[in-house]
């Protein structure tokens, strides 16, 4: 097994970004074999192997382009597996916690950044208490050196205070220790994120009124300034949920409607409709569509696609300028074009045209193949609808503005000439041609 670790890590050889995914997948295969040892009652042996594996991954950190974070994520899984194996093997929990802390302290590559979020889920109760005690001791030591200021925010404390404060909060959320979390906020100040977490702790305990009070507090704090990464975007949705649980469905619906009017989208539409009585669904659906249509094009398209309102979507697409569609991401338009193509070909063609134009206007040559595919769809749909002039207008625009994009225009002209799309040669055909070329002397 040690040989398998050594072979998979291949220390001394650099792993490029393009190879990093396959490299980590090979590491995962080895990890699965060690995981199996734990299940088969060989936890002690597994601990030794995990130990080598973790250290080996750290040795490899300088020999891999881990821009995608694959090795870092794998390390976190491996670290938690090592903890679980130590616990199953009945190793000293105090020693386990000390090793965890040392890894977190000696973390030159950031593999242990916020690793406490998963660690506390793996640690047993005894180990969590030891971990909490150690972090609390560090926090109190760092906090004791800080000059107190009434208006001080958590983000204004020194790094040692903030780091251990953050870890303590993670521990208290996982252990559902509301009182300890509240005491910590009393000492260091409360952020909107804290309010959301405390509200969720009360919600889990079905103390909905207490939860709602903390949501209200968080929303008030949000208005008092910029909280950066301590801002909370989940408070409004949580408030709707709590109002509903408290029997205040109408208030929850009113709040959902206010949010929908600000940001019409699939998500806000779903939230709104969950709170609507069955007999009022049609009314609220039409109301939401009307508001979205007058507020945001992408939101309106998303909702129409979700609810299959193809007629309304087709009418709206036909009434707007091409430039408006060209500003939208393909995430908003691609599903709409596919859905409209069956019965509303003209509207679908307009969207496909806009999708193609968006790519070539930006000049992203690596996406030209997608632009050509969009134009091919548009050509067929315009022709099927008997609106050849619209296709001709599009062709004139492309030729006039983008004829110097040589890696694109030649293939576009093939579409204009209605030349069939060439099917790529099969692998076998290409390989046999290459064999013939390699084994045949020129005349």
Regions found by a protein language model. Give the residues of each.
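Eukaryote-biased, non-catalytic alpha-solenoid scaffold regions
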Residues: 1-443
């Amino acid at each position: 097994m040690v040989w398998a670790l050594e072979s998979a890590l291949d220390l001394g050889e650099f792993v490029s970004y393009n190879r990093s995914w396959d490299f980590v997948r090979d590491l995962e295969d080895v990890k699965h074999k060690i995981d199996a040892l734990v299940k088969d009652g060989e936890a002690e042996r597994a601990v030794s192997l995990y130990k080598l594996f973790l250290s080996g991954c750290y040795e490899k950190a300088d020999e891999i382009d881990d821009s995608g974070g694959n090795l870092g994520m794998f390390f976190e899984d491996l670290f938690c597996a090592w903890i679980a194996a130590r616990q199953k093997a009945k190793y000293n929990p105090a020693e386990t916690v000390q090793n965890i802390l040392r890894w977190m302290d000696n973390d030159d590559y950031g593999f242990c950044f916020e690793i406490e979020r998963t660690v506390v889920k793996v640690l047993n109760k005894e180990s969590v208490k030891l971990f909490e005690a150690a972090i609390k001791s560090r926090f109190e030591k760092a906090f004791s050196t800080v000059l107190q200021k009434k208006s001080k925010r958590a983000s204004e404390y020194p790094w040692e205070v903030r780091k251990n404060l953050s870890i303590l909060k993670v521990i208290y959320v996982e252990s559902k220790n509301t009182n300890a979390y509240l005491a910590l906020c009393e000492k260091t100040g409360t952020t909107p994120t804290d309010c959301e977490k405390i509200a969720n702790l009360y919600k889990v305990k079905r103390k909905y009124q207490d939860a709602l009070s903390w949501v209200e507090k968080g929303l008030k704090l949000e208005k008092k300034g910029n909280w950066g990464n301590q801002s909370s975007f989940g408070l409004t949705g949580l408030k709707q949920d709590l109002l509903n649980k408290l029997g205040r469905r109408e208030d929850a619906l009113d709040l959902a409607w206010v949010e929908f009017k600000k940001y019409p989208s699939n998500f806000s539409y779903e939230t709104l409709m969950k709170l609507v009585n069955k007999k009022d669904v049609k009314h609220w659906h039409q109301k939401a569509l009307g508001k979205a249509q007058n507020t945001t094009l992408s939101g309106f398209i998303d909702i129409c696609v979700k609810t299959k309102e193809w007629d309304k979507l087709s009418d709206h697409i036909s009434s707007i300028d091409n430039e408006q569609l060209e500003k939208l991401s393909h995430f908003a338009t691609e599903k709409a074009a596919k859905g409209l193509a069956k019965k509303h070909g003209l509207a679908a063609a307009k969207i496909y045209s806009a999708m193609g134009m968006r790519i070539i206007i930006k000049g992203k040559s690596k996406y030209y193949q997608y632009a050509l595919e969009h134009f091919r769809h548009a050509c067929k749909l315009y022709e099927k609808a008997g609106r050849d002039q619209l296709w001709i207008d599009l062709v004139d625009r492309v030729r006039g503005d983008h004829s110097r994009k040589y890696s694109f225009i030649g293939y576009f002209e093939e579409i204009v000439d209605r030349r069939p799309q060439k099917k790529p040669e099969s692998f076998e055909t290409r390989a046999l041609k290459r064999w013939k070329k390699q084994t045949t002397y020129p005349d």
